[in-house]
Amino acid sequence: MEKMSKFSHLLKAHPCFNEKVHDKYGRVHLPVAPRCNIACKFCKRSVSKECCEHRPGVSLGVLKPEDVEDYLKKILKEMPNIKVVGIAGPGDSLFNKETFETLKIIDEKFPNLIKCISTNGLLLSKYYKDLANLNVRTITVTVNAIKPEILEKIVDWVYYDKKLYRGLEGAKLLIEKQIEGIKKASEEDFIIKINTVLIPEINMDHVVEIAKFFKDYAYVQNIIPLIPQYKMKELRAPTCEEIKKVRKECEKYIPQFRACGQCRADAVGLIKEKELLKEFFKEKNKEKNIKLEVFDLKHFSH
């Protein structure tokens, strides 16, 4: 409670942590992080000017850190209700050095904006102090299972310390690093949100265990429905009743966030809005489609 009191000014203006202000204050996601170090079976990243889907992992383009200042000035001029600047992809924020370059620019040029990142948590224990030094205080970590035998059905592989881990081995490693990172970040006074993708045929009865496990470390949990696509295109999305039921069970342990828009990596404005600054990317990227890097070992892309 002391931590929440200390950072109450952040929570009062953060639409992704406080659903009471989701239609009052806006956020901007900076798509500076294209590379990812895990392969979720439901995730299909896309970076293209033709991409009009409204879901995580997609963006009109990849923004370079040197363009961030101009980009934010344009946004803040058009949308003065923007209070939060976040980095949420289209890959994993902590697996891209551009994330830290961008956060440094924001901290120097836009100190009044709340800085936020989303991550799979694999590298959180390695970088949480760097984030603290850049005055980041809100972190979202996606945790879809805390049992390896469940997570291996959701994640194909994990790339860590220049080595690829598949199946159960990769799932064990990811869970271990997520728990380590979340605990350390919580001790460092970060405000943490746990995102959990609800996959009825895989983790429906397990999500409450995630809530129980992280109840002393997370401020809020955001349970979001599976978008059937990629390797999970044959699976079904949860019904509204199923989502309500799981949230009610989890709410016994962690407060639930119910205003998530499952936003793009380049989302701008209020959560309910679908604003995209197409003209900016038109000017910065002349190619028809922008090549998406996966990571250094490109033959492991997905």
Swiss-Prot record:
It comes from Methanocaldococcus infernus (strain DSM 11812 / JCM 15783 / ME). Pathway: Cofactor biosynthesis; Fe-Mo cofactor biosynthesis. Transmembrane segments: none annotated. S-adenosyl-L-methionine binds at G91, T142, I194. [4Fe-4S] cluster 1 binds at C36, C40, C43. One of its GO terms (molecular function) is lyase activity. This is FeMo cofactor biosynthesis protein NifB. Pfam families: Radical_SAM. Belongs to the radical SAM superfamily. NifB family. GO terms for biological process: nitrogen fixation. Monomer. Its cofactor is [4Fe-4S] cluster. Keywords: 4Fe-4S, Iron, Iron-sulfur, Lyase, Metal-binding, Nitrogen fixation, S-adenosyl-L-methionine. [4Fe-4S] cluster 2 binds at C260, C263. Changing C36A: Loss of activity.
